[in-house]
Amino acid sequence: MKKNLRIVSAAAAALLAVAPVAASAVSTVSAATTINASSSAINTNTNAKYDVDVTPSVSAVAANTANNTPAIAGNLTGTISASYNGKTYTANLKADTENATITAAGSTTAVKPAELAAGVAYTVTVNDVSFNFGSENAGKTVTLGSANSNVKFTGTNSDNQTETNVSTLKVKLDQNGVASLTNVSIANVYAINTTDNSNVNFYDVTSGATVTNGAVSVNADNQGQVNVANVVAAINSKYFAAQYADKKLNTRTANTEDAIKAALKDQKIDVNSVGYFKAPHTFTVNVKATSNTNGKSATLPVVVTVPNVAEPTVASVSKRIMHNAYYYDKDAKRVGTDSVKRYNSVSVLPNTTTINGKTYYQVVENGKAVDKYINAANIDGTKRTLKHNAYVYASSKKRANKVVLKKGEVVTTYGASYTFKNGQKYYKIGDNTDKTYVKVANFR
């Protein structure tokens, strides 16, 4: 069944008019915000912390009234996305504030979008939000949550109790399959100063020099484990993010901890409830810092090495190259100008891989498979059938032996052909270093 999501709203929420990803519509029949989805949209994964992932995306522009720049009115725009079973649907909310409230952190005084200031953390609260799962889901219990930790829910839970500003909310759908919430709030929304063009950079703590990549080292405990906090400390003690303004560097907060967890997740490494994980020998963390002033950001890739954890090695075999061979990458493109000369040996993975219809061996260096491949024809050869009886030659003028290969015989040749002094082309035959060649013209 095709999932459909639409939003019904009048003056719904100081959020933006952006084209929806999924089928959606905006109307003015109700002052509330309603998200509709088909019955198959409910996530039934019992391991999930919540069934429905609700993620508002909000951006704000700060008002500018400086004399030397054009006047800019502040504004707040955005979308609400709901994710079910790995699919995301985005709905638009109207760009006004009739049923939304903007407040500065620590204040209950409402702020108009036109008056938003740069560098201030705001909370946007969207009132009267409903999720419609259809009458076929009437009476079911679902849990609402968000991957964004700044998103909170207020409403009546499935036990008929009011919960305020909670990260997840378990609700019972009504007779129409609708979950009704008092509000959804998004904290730490910053208005961007569009007249500020200063960039964010990462710096070395010791030298003060700008850096574009980094490296740190941490040791594992006697069980081969490292705590995320130790990696955070190692990175933050060596590098910091800052933005130059008013003749000084203003530090910017980096997402170091989240970046570490994301890097480990990419390697399918679990982090336990107290932050410990089974450490690999190395992994790369992409630390990002974003300015709350103008929205500029920078990313610093940091290689984390755990020296007392052995680097894993892959099984490899040694293969003799029977024909001069170039290296190729995973897309079958030449890697530099280096080549392996014939009769030398190279370490490769035991099994071949196919790239663009051709068979290759992946190269192993220092116990690790690298992005370098050698055409298998230069190692294993290619089986070809003779269409004529053929002699075996050592050179253009001299036979290698008295052997006569018979028509119809299958012979293994290695690599591309060679052109001899007589202008004719020959294939190398024989898995050895002997000078044994057969004319290309003798093969089918």
Curated annotation (Swiss-Prot):
Q: What is its main location?
A: secreted
Spell out the subcellular localization from the entry: Secreted, Cell wall, S-layer
The reply on keyword Chaperone is: no
Cite the entry's keywords alphabetically.
Cell wall, Glycoprotein, S-layer, Secreted, Signal
**PTM entry text:** Glycosylated.
Q: List the disulfide bonds.
A: none
- Keyword check for Glycoprotein, yes or no: yes
Q: Where is the signal peptide?
A: 1-24
GO MF annotations in UniProt: structural constituent of cell wall
Q: Name one GO cellular component term.
A: peptidoglycan-based cell wall
Judging by the UniProt lineage, the source's domain of life is Bacteria
A Pfam family matched in the record: SlpA_D2
Q: What is the protein's known function?
A: The S-layer is a paracrystalline mono-layered assembly of proteins which coat the surface of bacteria.
Write down what this protein is called: S-layer protein
Q: Which organism is it from?
A: Lactobacillus acidophilus (strain ATCC 700396 / NCK56 / N2 / NCFM)
Q: Gene encoding this polypeptide? A: slpA
